[in-house]
């Protein structure tokens, strides 16, 4: 896995680089002429801040990358990582689907041949304030939750489009993973509400796609233990106790037997990477990364006066735990009723938010919408191999797995992830038979 130290160095280079050359129609001060150590590329990059609350000094940091080819005609895709509190720049941009990966020593950059900017312009935002180098001058703003996070993102997008007016009319896709299962549906919901009230500018939202999303906490939690059991990681006894004694919808009702079983499950799975159960855990690497991170200076500290160091996932936030229990299915229902396509995709090696719960919740949502099955559950293909399994309801709701992928789908299976994303963005169904001409560049 890409080391956190390498990611940090890449991000520090990104926002400390000198801003040069004016880009017509785009903000001169945010244009990145070149990242030291990067390969030669033909696309432009922008990075900087957007104030979402000028009075209290609350600003969100973004990184925008143009598409490799024909960026003037390509759509715009927003990507948000989850957590809550993890960096979309450090995670999404420089670990998963952005144009560059740090080299092994963290001193340079190499091209990501499966970057999603082959298909779309990409926008990564560190949200909420307190994540990465997004900040507020008022410390109480770090006591936050879903509502304030989504409202800030709406303000961010409106003001970001003022920086990039040529992109206002572009097709917009909202994507992310994990706790973005809360961010993206609620953001799409408030955007559609904004559109209904606005007599002027309207967001041109064409679809949302979320990987291994937290949609309904009690169901996702329970599914994790079913996943452990189905993969031989916990005993029959532990699984049955959790099934019969644990009330994940109301943690206060959990019995002692439930708590003991959960502890036993934690012991049994202690030496497994829950986010990718096939990867070995490398303890020296983890410790070394943490030590290096703690010695890093805050990015752009002289400008933002951040009193803390950058980390992949923020320890500054006091994020509302109650918000994690909000059911996202009603938001998804409203989005779909607005004729906006929704894709839910799952890496099948993730035990944190496993495919079992996502698949079941998508089916229940389809039933609530009275949708018929428009694609029966079956394999989809990429490069003559099974890329995963997929089903579709009512031509608007899709559930797809990505074979061999995990919690961070684009990192674990970049080629299959790009093929899936390109299909989603272009309104194409995933192929249900091998195709010798299948390409990741479509």
UniProtKB/Swiss-Prot annotation:
The keyword Magnesium does not apply. Disulfide bonds join 86-313, 246-258. The keyword Signal applies. Keywords: Carboxypeptidase, Disulfide bond, Glycoprotein, Hydrolase, Protease, Secreted, Signal. Glycans are attached at residues 137, 253, 302, 318. It comes from the Eukaryota. The active site is at 178, 350, 407. GO terms for cellular component: extracellular region. Residues 1-23 form the signal peptide. Expression not detected. InterPro entries: AB_hydrolase_fold, Peptidase_S10, Ser_caboxypep_ser_AS. PROSITE patterns: CARBOXYPEPT_SER_SER. GO terms for molecular function: serine-type carboxypeptidase activity. Pfam families: Peptidase_S10. It is found in: Secreted. It is an enzyme of class 3 (hydrolase). SUPFAM superfamilies: alpha/beta-Hydrolases. One of its GO terms (biological process) is proteolysis. Its EC number is 3.4.16.-. PANTHER family: SERINE CARBOXYPEPTIDASE-LIKE 41-RELATED, SERINE PROTEASE FAMILY S10 SERINE CARBOXYPEPTIDASE. Probable carboxypeptidase. Belongs to the peptidase S10 family. This is Serine carboxypeptidase-like 43.
